[in-house]
Amino acid sequence: MAREKFERNKPHVNIGTIGHVDHGKTTLTAAITSVLAKKGQAKVQDYAEIDGAPEERERGITINTAHVEYETDGRHYAHVDCPGHADYVKNMITGAAQMDGAILVCAATDGPMAQTKEHILLAKQVGVPALVVALNKCDMVDDEEIIELVEMEIRELLSSYDFPGDDIPIVQVSGLKAIEGEAEWEAKIDELMDAVDTSIPEPEREIEKPFLMAVEDVFSITGRGTVATGRIERGKVKKGEEIEIVGIRDSRKTTVTGVEMFRKDLDEGLAGDNCGLLLRGIEKEDIERGMVLVKPGSITPHTKFEGQVYVLKKEEGGRHTPFFAGYRPQFYIRTTDVTGQITAFTAEDGSNVEMVMPGDNIKMTGELICPVAIEQGMRFAIREGGRTIGAGVVSKIIQ
């Protein structure tokens, strides 16, 4: 059978289900596929298929994730669902599953629980821009007042983590009853998908953002000058444009005198391309791996930041022993290791943490020895002697 061609006639959005264990994330995911399948917009996937997600490795960390795709009238969605709580933590921090928005699943029978809170905090820290709430298992609650109380509690919780709690849609659903084909609950899944369509904004495409390419290698070509190679992370670059070299040393501007890919000249390089940029008046010594080439003024180098970090367990190849504030690892940022120091660890409630154990999910403050182009929402790894011992995301730039 010939492979189906991916039709790109609708905008594409990445979403996922988050929330407390046993509140019905996977059942709801299965319900979305079963309801949309009746309109020919999805392939039915049952609970067992989604729950038995294969292991994936992202930066050496093992994560179980199920990927489901479906479409609504206006959009194409890629949806991720994770079987275990630890998988969510790792997934969101490593950015293995980049989410443009998420469906927060909360059972009406329980209300918000510990992991409901932790997932909302994580979503905030890693920069998930928008949430929609699916209040699940509503078929099991007869008392309308209880449902109202749970909704109020969820709204207050969302607001306490700086999400617009009063405006986020909360849709009463029953994943199980929708799968069983009960019409009123199938209609609720449609209502949920309408809320997702309207409340989760379409992501800005990488190509429309300001140009950035991290330098992987530098060559000098006799008679032509210096070429920096790498993958264009976002935006585009044309021959003749001015760019800025940022990070490690003082920023400086130069002009791109050529863009080449596979030894052929291009008019312009686009997001996703691996290419070489020929730079005017730059010596090979002026530029090194770890610097970035950017649209002038679009990014400034920083040394101090806050990050949300997952510390690998011993079984994942991480450390066997705890570490403390003052620890000096390498931070692997884009294409290079930069030495830095972790000056403080903070718990969820804002209190200081003395000791961090393998397997922890923690907020840290880091300081690098030289300024690098770091940005909010950017992923990094923490390494020690060349092996990864943690994965993190920049939650805030300090200086």
From Swiss-Prot:
Gene expressing this chain: tuf
Region described as G5: 174-176
Annotated spans, G2: 60-64
This protein's name: Elongation factor Tu
Keyword Cell membrane: no
EC number: 3.6.5.3
Ranges of residues in domain tr-type G: 10-204
Residues reported in the UniProt entry to bind Mg(2+): T26
GO CC term, one of those recorded: cytosol
PANTHER family per record: ELONGATION FACTOR TU, MITOCHONDRIAL, ELONGATION FACTOR TU-RELATED
Stretches the record annotates as G3: 81-84
Record Pfam families: GTP_EFTU, GTP_EFTU_D2, GTP_EFTU_D3
